[in-house]
Amino acid sequence: MAVKIRLAKKGRKKLALYDIVVADQRAPRDGRFIEKLGNYNPNTNPSTVVLHEDKVIQWLFNGAQPTNTVKNILSSQGILLKRHLQIGVKKGAITQEEADKRFLVWKESKTQKPGKFKA
C-alpha cells in the first residue's frame, strides 16, 4: 500500500479550500483518507496553512510520499528542513541543540525577507 500526503478539496466552486491528508494513493481525491494533517486556504493573501507538524514528520519518517504541491507547502513551512535535520540527529552527525539552532536561524531569516506580494 503506497501512502501519499496530498490535498483533498473542500469548499465550493471558485472558492476551494483543501485539507492536507494522508491517504492510500488508490483512494479517490476527496474520498477515503487515513488521517487529516491540516488545511490549506489559497484564497487569502498570503495563503493560509495550518499543520500538525509532529504528525507530518512522523508520516514522512514512516515512508509517506508528499505530492508535488504538498511538498512545496511543506518546504515553505520548514517541515522538510526539520525532517532533514532530524535525520542528521539520528545518524549522529549533529546534536539536537544544533538542529534546533539551525531551524531557528532559518525561521528568522524567512520572517525578515519581504514577501513576493505586497498588499
From Swiss-Prot:
Gene Ontology BP terms: translation
One Pfam family this sequence matches: Ribosomal_S16
HAMAP family associated with the record: Ribosomal_bS16
Protein name in the entry: Small ribosomal subunit protein bS16
One annotated GO molecular function: structural constituent of ribosome
GO cellular component, one term: cytoplasm
Family named by the database record: Belongs to the bacterial ribosomal protein bS16 family.
Gene expressing this chain: rpsP
Superkingdom of origin: Bacteria
Keyword Ribosomal protein: yes
Family matches, as InterPro entries: Ribosomal_bS16, Ribosomal_bS16_dom_sf
Presence of the UniProt keyword Transferase in the record: no
Alphabetical keyword list: Ribonucleoprotein, Ribosomal protein
NCBIfam families noted in UniProt: S16 (TIGR00002)
